[in-house]
């Protein structure tokens, strides 16, 4: 892995984990305002019990991405982040929400893809052709 790729990986991963942690904690404690918070979920038409589920999954995903071992669990975490952000983007588009509401999920989706693509070899799954 080149130094450039390592820098890209860590910058994307740090910003991704900060974003997922902050929104995840906000969802767990059911903040009224903010990205993915109570007012946002009500606006999108989702039940509030999803806040706790999504918040806990985000925190678990952050832990999986940051720990150095368990590449299969990392892959699941990255795919979960992609599913969450694609779902968030679609939800905002489906209700004809203000385009500025797409920025947060789009940024986290891009950071997820960058972190996944530039992850070090030791954090990838070894694939064996049969």
For each predicted feature, which ranges?
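Membrane-interface extramembranous regions
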Residues: 1-130
């Amino acid at each position: 892995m080149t130094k450039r790729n390592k820098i890209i990986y860590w910058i994307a991963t740090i910003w991704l984990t900060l974003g997922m942690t902050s929104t995840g904690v906000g969802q767990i404690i059911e903040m009224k305002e903010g990205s993915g918070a109570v007012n946002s979920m009500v606006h999108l038409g989702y039940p509030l019990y999803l806040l706790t589920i999504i918040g806990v999954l985000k925190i678990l995903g952050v832990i999986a991405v940051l720990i150095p071992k368990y590449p299969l669990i990392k892959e699941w975490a990255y795919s979960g982040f992609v599913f969450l952000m694609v779902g968030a983007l679609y939800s905002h588009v489906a209700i004809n929400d203000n385009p500025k509401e797409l920025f947060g999920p789009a940024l986290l989706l891009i950071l997820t893809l960058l972190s996944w693509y530039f992850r070090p070899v030791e954090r990838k799954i070894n694939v064996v052709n049969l």
